[in-house]
């Protein structure tokens, strides 16, 4: 994963051992900014529950190895997954002592393509229960267009 920091005009690679670190000083981690590797976790259905009017599955995810626990920075998570469209509305993260340390709530989604069933979270909120801090991320403008692969290079991102 790479991140471009426009204020510094620098591109930085985020290696796997940095997934658990804070994303730009926020309560989100670098791992929270990407889709997780599905093979990195084992899954268990913990139940079904309504959440804010959405009928959801409660899915517990556990990293399949201690190396992956260290990489992601938590021992397990529980997510409320919408039964209709499989969007994740809320996730609780538990530390290595089994204590809840972070909650992420996905408040709004934008459908990216008609008929494709692809969505993007456009409003998310992270609450850190260990330090009582929170962060909110809102993406006001989201557009999906055809993009040349050349845009996804360090040289292109850092051009003047």
Predicted features and spans:
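Gly/Pro-enriched, hydrophobic low-complexity segments
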Residues: 12-14, 19-36, 52-154
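Short, solvent-exposed mixed-charge patches
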Residues: 159-160
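A short, amphipathic edge element
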Residues: 33-46
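N-terminal mature ectodomain segment of secretory-pathway/periplasmic proteins
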Residues: 1-5
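Short aromatic-centered micro-motifs
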Residues: 49
